[in-house]
């Protein structure tokens, strides 16, 4: 898992992807202490190396759930799971809602996507869902509509260029507004696992 800070479960499957490597920036020591506190003396916590990378792929589901619950908020977290070949970017809001965003795909046959899940791991919203209704992304209150369009990638290109400089990301859907701080936005350029072509979510 790589946290400059970063993470996921889906019950944990959707928010964590089970495993990973996390990279930290200014909060490396703080997050390292949090990670250490997640594990008992009997089950020694993995060490974060000088590059801020920690491998938790062999930890139990319960330990990963605790890690997700304690992950930093208001910033991007990069989760790397070499065993499963899964790479994700997560952003946890103050209320616990998690945004998973995939803008640059490791596999060219996959397409960029996003999803929202509750603090409990319940799916709230996902890209390309025909039943989702209107979705609007706002970057620093500028409306970019829904950049995840099956017919054209032009809106997504605009969104990709703008999000790198944004401070706040908002998503509006079904009369609800979700707000995320865009901390560690440099992680958004990292290639991640995206959605399989033809998949619905």
Identify the meaning behind each predicted range.
Residues 1-8:
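Bacterial N-terminal signal peptides that target proteins for export
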Residues 8-14:
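Hydrophobic helical h-region of N-terminal Sec-dependent signal peptides
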Residues 127-132:
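Short coil-to-beta strand junction motifs in C2/discoidin
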Residues 22-24:
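Bacterial signal peptide processing site
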Residues 32-125:
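An ectodomain-focused feature that recognizes extracytoplasmic/extracellular
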């Amino acid at each position: 898992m790589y946290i400059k800070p970063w993470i996921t479960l889906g019950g944990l499957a959707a928010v964590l992807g089970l495993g990973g490597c996390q990279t930290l920036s200014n909060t490396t020591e703080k997050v390292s202490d949090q990670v250490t506190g997640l594990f008992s003396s009997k089950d020694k916590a993995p060490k974060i190396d000088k590059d801020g990378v920690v491998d938790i792929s062999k930890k139990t589901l319960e330990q990963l759930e605790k890690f997700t619950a304690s992950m930093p908020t208001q910033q991007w977290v990069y989760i790397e799971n070499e065993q499963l070949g899964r790479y994700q970017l997560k952003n946890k809001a103050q209320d616990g809602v998690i945004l998973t965003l995939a803008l640059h795909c490791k596999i060219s046959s996959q397409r960029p996507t996003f999803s929202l899940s509750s603090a409990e791991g319940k799916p709230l919203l996902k890209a390309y869902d025909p039943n989702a209704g209107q979705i609007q992304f706002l970057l620093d209150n500028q409306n970019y509509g829904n950049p995840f369009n099956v017919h054209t990638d032009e809106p997504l290109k605009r969104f990709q260029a703008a999000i790198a400089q944004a401070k706040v990301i908002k998503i509006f859907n079904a009369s609800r507004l979700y707000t995320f701080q865009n901390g560690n936005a440099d992680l958004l350029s990292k290639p991640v696992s995206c959605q399989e072509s033809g998949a619905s979510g």
